[in-house]
From Swiss-Prot:
GO terms for biological process: photosynthesis, light reaction. It comes from Brachypodium distachyon (Purple false brome). The lineage of its organism: Eukaryota, Viridiplantae, Streptophyta, Embryophyta, Tracheophyta. Signal peptide: none annotated. Keywords: Chloroplast, Membrane, NAD, NADP, Plastid, Plastoquinone, Quinone, Thylakoid, Translocase, Transmembrane, Transmembrane helix, Transport. This is NAD(P)H-quinone oxidoreductase subunit 3, chloroplastic. One of its GO terms (cellular component) is chloroplast thylakoid membrane. It comes from the Eukaryota. It holds the Pfam family Oxidored_q4. GO terms for molecular function: NADH dehydrogenase (ubiquinone) activity; quinone binding. Its main location: plastid. Belongs to the complex I subunit 3 family. NDH is composed of at least 16 different subunits, 5 of which are encoded in the nucleus.
Length: 120
């Protein structure tokens, strides 16, 4: 037997948490003044006259470096709780964490060989 009524608070919270930003955007769209013109389309640089265009191209190598950083940053987030509760967890959790780290090391070696970690 499912006790779905126990989740009423969760569903209420989820609905309210979804409605608040939707209503905020909707109300600001109704009340905000609409102004169009060349000044609206120019880039804003803290009150200083813009020097050049707003579109700059970045090399793809920066994105690859950032992607590798994010992957290993997320790895740290996953490994920290495991390290803090290592003494109460069993051997199976240690093996799972070891496999997780091994997969990430394989990914690091792959990124290294492909040159994703090179700045030049």
């Amino acid at each position: 037997m499912f006790l779905l009524h126990e989740y009423d608070i969760f569903w209420t919270f989820l609905i309210i948490a979804s409605l608040i930003p939707i209503l905020a955007f909707w109300i600001s769209g109704l009340l905000a003044p609409i102004s169009e013109g060349p000044e609206k389309l120019s880039s804003y640089e803290s009150g200083i006259e813009p020097m050049g265009g707003a579109w700059l191209q970045f090399r793809i190598r920066y994105y690859m470096f950032a992607l590798v950083f994010v992957v290993f940053d997320v790895e740290t987030v996953f490994l920290y709780p495991w390290a803090m509760s290592f003494d109460v967890l069993g051997v199976s959790v240690f093996i799972e964490a070891f496999i997780f780290v091994l997969i990430l090391v394989v990914g690091l070696v792959y990124a290294w060989r492909k040159g994703a970690l090179e700045w030049s």
